[in-house]
Amino acid sequence: PIHRNKHLLKGIAAERILVELTKMLCAQGAAGVLRDFADVLAVPIPELTPMFGFPQHNPHHDKDVWEHTIAVIESITPEPVLRWAALLHDIGKPSCFSLAEDGIGHFFGHSDQSTSMAESILSRLRFDNASKEQIVRLVRYHDMPITADRKPIKRLLSKHGEDATRQLIELHKADTLGQSAICRHRIAIFEEVSQMINEILQEESCFTLKDLAV
């Protein structure tokens, strides 16, 4: 009956939809619900539909875009900002897909496209501004190169602050866990970066005035 009556969701207030979707995304069985009720989820968020079953044609990915997204959600802390960022981080991929002559799929510009789509979706669902800003930032930077190098990590901390930087590293790690086995070696890099963040902060190398010890 849920699948049959999914159109009724269109009559429910965005705020109510947001509460229920957030509960579902953060629940223990989120992956199963996302698989079994993808069509229902696509009523309030139709932008998800192109992801369902979309092949990536890339050795770094052994899953379609939707299954990869579910794997990332499963691998990340069940906290609203992180789970929503995981849901939306690759939403722009299908519209950015191109197939090279060698048969390898590419998604050039998908971070920008996903960011734009995430902003639109989160606004439509009446997200509070602070959460929306955090989620959009994570989507925007989810594909940036991360190395276990102090200088760029200090720059990240300076630009985004501790909490957002830690969230970003966690999303990168979850994203990698959702990719094929040949990418798994990168997990160690994110572990190293997390440790590096701890060391930098312990040394009180603070870069924003509000974080300076007075």
Region spans (language model):
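Charged substrate- and nucleic-acid-binding regions of tRNA-handling and nucleotidyl-transfer enzymes
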Residues: 1, 120-124, 176-214
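Glycine- and charge-enriched loop/helix tracts that form the active or gating conduit
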Residues: 1-87, 91-109, 113-127
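Generic structural signal of hydrophobic/aromatic residues within well-ordered alpha-helices
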Residues: 2-6, 21, 33-34, 44-48, ...
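Short secondary-structure junctions and interdomain/linker hinges
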Residues: 9-12, 28-32, 40-45, 55, ...
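General structural feature for long, well-ordered alpha-helical segments within catalytic domains
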Residues: 17, 33, 68, 87, ...
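A glycine-rich phosphate-binding loop feature that marks nucleotide/adenosyl-phosphate handling sites
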Residues: 39, 51-54, 90, 134-142, ...
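Histidine/acidic-rich helix-loop-helix segments that form or flank divalent-metal centers
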Residues: 56-74, 127-184
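Active-site lining segments that contact anionic ligands and/or coordinate catalytic metals
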Residues: 79, 83, 136, 163-171, ...
